[in-house]
Amino acid sequence: MERLLVWIEHISDWLWGPPLIILLTGTGLYFTILLKGFQFRYPLYIFKQTIGSVGKKPKGEGTVTPLQALTSALSSTIGAANIVGVPAAIMFGGPGAVFWMWLIALFAMAIKFSESVLAVHYREKNEQGEYVGGPMYYITKGLRMKWLGVFFSVALIVELIPSIMVQGNSVSVSLAETFSFNKIYAGIGIAFLIGLVVIGGVKRIGKVTEFVVPLMAGAYAGAGLLIVLMNLSSVPAFFSLVFSNAFTSSSAVGGFAGAALAETVRWGFARGLYSNEAGMGTAPIAHAAAMTDHPVRQGFWSVIGIVIDTLIICTTTAFIVLASGVWTGKNASNDPAALTTAAFQHYFGSGGGYFVSVSLVFFVVSTIMVVIFYGVKQAEFLFGRLAGHVIKFVYLAAIIIGAAGGAKAIWGVLDLALVFIVVPNVIALLLLSRKVKALYTEFFTSEQYYLKDIRKTKQKPVYPTKEAKNS
């Protein structure tokens, strides 16, 4: 069994190296070109239609508000990858990995935008009156390939079990180390609290994440901003360190062993993609339930999600780790996951360590909450509502098993399982790219949407190119 797990881990490491990085990066570039670089052409408009519309009555039909859909999607992306994944990228790829993480985030916006657009376009209303959608629906309805939609759903249901076990292990260990709780009891308590939320369905999850996500993300980014203000003189040095190491091999410094340019690019791309989940098909499940008058309008919210997750939260972690100097510590490479805690302790003493532990708990708990919802929707798609109720308890049990230590042997299994949801989803995105472009063109050339919004604010419109209009 041990040899099998080692074999699986080697395969996972290889797949999450060049193969998937090339696939996802290529897809991001393709959609960026296809949609004429919309994320660069309409940044202010996108911001006004998302963050700028908070507090206004949503347009169109849906189950949850656009903000609740975003916070639900962010709950599954803002987590351990932001706190422990970024230091790992720095230790194994060097400071320059941060640049490549930023770069891939810009192209990943086009992937997540396209996922959400298709999810809303092909969504359905279930027996309870809730809007449901995601890859399983746009694969089945858009491509008329139900077998592939079923494959995606089954793969996601299976993948979420080790994912939840790993997350359950992370939060229980954090509570045990910080507050001396028993790990198993901590797992049971977390499972109970999460159960109270997920049993209430998408509306309750939306209400909880709408409160928790802005609070926890704001607190973490706020702490990072405070450190920036305490170290304003270090800001130019931070950017210099990142850019000077982005295009050359990084030399060894202290506990940092150095990194070849290829490793710098690989770690930056991999951590960026892993953090924002572009191409994985999970976030569109949340966005499909949003109240909106057009799929493209909800797609803008997924773009903002990457801004918050990668460009703000991950950058906050990167600055703190690099500015504090902990990445050059004697034994830094032995445990990159501990660098964020060490960096906060560098500035705030023991209180900084408690802050990171509490942040990690909130991040992980909200992640588990939402991924259980994703699994429930897959079970309902395959077998109906009763199966959705059953799978909730399977996932809640996985939290407790993970808390007991059962997750340690399946990290490789988790990464391998992710491949089986990424590949069919990306294939579907590419095959449905003409539909994405048609919806994009419709939104930006119709008098009902973009042109109407621009006239209200008396802004000069930015029209799609002739090629887009004629598509």
From Swiss-Prot:
Please tell me whether the keyword Cell division is annotated for this protein. Answer: no
Give yes or no: UniProt keyword Transmembrane: yes
Q: Which organism is it from?
A: Bacillus subtilis (strain 168)
| InterPro entries linked | Na/Ala_symport (IPR001463)
What is one cellular component GO term in this UniProt entry?
plasma membrane
Keywords from the UniProt entry: Cell membrane, Membrane, Symport, Transmembrane, Transmembrane helix, Transport
Provide the protein name: Uncharacterized transporter YflA
Entry membrane topology: Multi-pass membrane protein
Annotated family: Belongs to the alanine or glycine:cation symporter (AGCS) (TC 2.A.25) family.
Cellular localisation:
Cell membrane
Where does it mainly reside? membrane
Q: Which Gene3D superfamilies match?
A: Amino acid/polyamine transporter I (1.20.1740.10)
State the Gene Ontology terms under molecular function.
Answer: amino acid:sodium symporter activity
Kindly give the Pfam families that the UniProt entry links to this protein.
Na_Ala_symp
Q: Which NCBIfam families match?
A: agcS
Q: Give the superkingdom in one word.
A: Bacteria
Chain segments annotated as transmembrane: 15-35, 66-86, 89-109, 147-167, 179-199, 210-230, 237-257, 303-323, 353-373, 386-406, 410-430
